[in-house]
């Protein structure tokens, strides 16, 4: 079960609980949008795969950016390089001489921690500074947006979902090393 399904079911549960739809209607909606949800999850997976591919190239070309990224994340208490079995500065230098950057599993660890750091920092922003509703709406399939617009706006995890969408959009496109000076 993906986070998309959980967040959708949470919203629909609130609709059932309030009496706006029945359990049968909820189940019908879930059946109708199953393919859309799967496609959305797969799109996110593709974007994360692209992030890792681009970060792999970036880490080969500029190992010092990845080193700086890991140091910043460590300084912020977000990353424990030793616990995550990530290379030391010396190991990165040796790899760079050999034309090697971080390996994809290592990049996935750095990307996850970078995303969590960006996400936490976005949550600290005052409400209204970011167009949260736009990102929240984009998270849900079109059929849900048109039928349950009010429920989306009232989603109990609306801000968190919106900041997750924004975090993924930024980091997946700009890379794990991009947003660390914020």
Residue locations for each model-derived region?
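Ligand/cofactor-recognition surfaces for anionic moieties
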Residues: 1-182
């Amino acid at each position: 079960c993906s986070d998309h399904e959980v967040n959708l079911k949470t919203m629909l549960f609130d609709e059932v609980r309030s009496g706006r739809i029945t359990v049968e209607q909820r189940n019908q909606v879930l059946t109708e949008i199953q393919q859309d949800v799967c496609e959305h999850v797969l799109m996110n997976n593709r974007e994360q795969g692209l992030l890792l591919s681009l970060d792999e190239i970036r880490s080969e070309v500029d190992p010092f950016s990845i080193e700086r990224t890991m140091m910043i994340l460590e300084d912020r208490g977000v990353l424990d390089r030793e616990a995550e079995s990530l290379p030391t500065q010396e190991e990165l230098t040796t790899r760079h001489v050999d034309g090697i950057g971080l390996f994809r599993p290592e990049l996935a660890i750095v990307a996850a921690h970078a995303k969590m750091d960006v996400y936490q920092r976005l949550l600290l922003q005052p409400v209204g500074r970011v167009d949260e509703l736009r990102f929240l709406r984009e998270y849900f399939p079109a059929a849900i947006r048109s039928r349950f617009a009010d429920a989306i706006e009232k989603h109990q995890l609306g801000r968190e979902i919106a900041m997750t969408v924004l975090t993924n959009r930024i980091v997946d496109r700009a890379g794990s090393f991009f947003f660390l000076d914020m």
